[in-house]
């Protein structure tokens, strides 16, 4: 287990990504084609930036990435990658959405590797994680384009099945995935929604 964790940490450093979490998104991307060239991507809870950087590479120079976090991320997209705009805001505050919309009003993909500060209480941690996930889903309903894609990290426990059902109701296809690069002992999984059913006005 430790060897696997060390492998991904070392690989991230070698590949010039801030954190090993990039390989969780990479694994999901290879299997489900979440992000395409030219896409607009909103990354909630983006710090330290691995997912945003990887998403910018997938989207290419005609795409755009907006990363939001309470902690200020730094750096930009790599050569031949989409520009990255960093926003230091709380996703629970209206000012965050206003700041995002000043850059771009809508997105084709919403991604989130966000996690709460853990307490050690499994039930409490799971519920706090779910609260954040529901917040990302609410934001998706406001900014995601029709047929857009969504992926969000969540800790299993508590009302987790209800959250999965909520995603299923909003997307044509939804599933729960556990990347190989996730720590074996971790309760984290990712809920994936493909092809958002945007309500018709």
Curated annotation (Swiss-Prot):
Location of the active site: 153 (proton acceptor)
The reaction(s) this protein catalyses: uridine(2552) in 23S rRNA + S-adenosyl-L-methionine = 2'-O-methyluridine(2552) in 23S rRNA + S-adenosyl-L-homocysteine + H(+)
Gene Ontology terms, MF aspect: rRNA (uridine-2'-O-)-methyltransferase activity
Keywords: Cytoplasm, Methyltransferase, rRNA processing, S-adenosyl-L-methionine, Transferase
Localization per Swiss-Prot or TrEMBL: Cytoplasm
Binding site for S-adenosyl-L-methionine: 49, 51, 69, 90, 113
EC number(s) stated in the UniProt entry for this protein: 2.1.1.166
Domain of life assignment: Bacteria
The UniProt record lists the keyword S-adenosyl-L-methionine: yes
Biological role: Specifically methylates the uridine in position 2552 of 23S rRNA at the 2'-O position of the ribose in the fully assembled 50S ribosomal subunit.
The protein's name in its UniProt record: Ribosomal RNA large subunit methyltransferase E
Annotated source species: Desulfotalea psychrophila (strain LSv54 / DSM 12343)
Gene name in the database record: rlmE
